[in-house]
Amino acid sequence: MKRMLINAKTVALVDGQRLYDLDIESGAREQKKANIYKGRITRIEPSLEAAFVDFGSERHGFLPLKEISREYFKKAPEGRVNIKDVLSEGQEVIVQVEKEERGNKGAALTTFISLAGRYLVLMPNNPRAGGISRRIEGEERNELREALNGLVAPADMGLIVRTAGLGRSSEEMQWDLDYLLQL
């Protein structure tokens, strides 16, 4: 039987009596997930369709092609996109950590920035993204969609209504959006 044992700073995954994964949070190692950094491309690896980014951590982060926003594309993509046509070594990029460093692997990075607020998630460089949390269904979903349509948001940004947005007025959501836009 697989189980997950969680303590304040330790997570252990066990199968029967066998430990198969252990993650210990140490006070010396700060969490980087969701942090946003200005990084520099150090190496482009066409075979992996990815780039390695120096963002200030001891290991360089991994940035796959699918996680690169269209704002970094020099020209509109025609057919299959080659990462060398999108990025160049030494180029500066704004990245967000999606997955922490683990073992000998660097952090997984994205250029699709997301800023989580109390009721909304703002995606400043992803205008096509947005909607309602997947956990919300039925009539509540329709009500939130109407509230979302009533928000005054920049056209080049995406928004997602979080589960905490349930039962909130358009004014409360607009306040949250205005706060996120100031960041």
Q: Across the structure, where does each feature detected by a protein language model lie?
A:
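Single-stranded RNA-binding surfaces
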Residues: 1-183
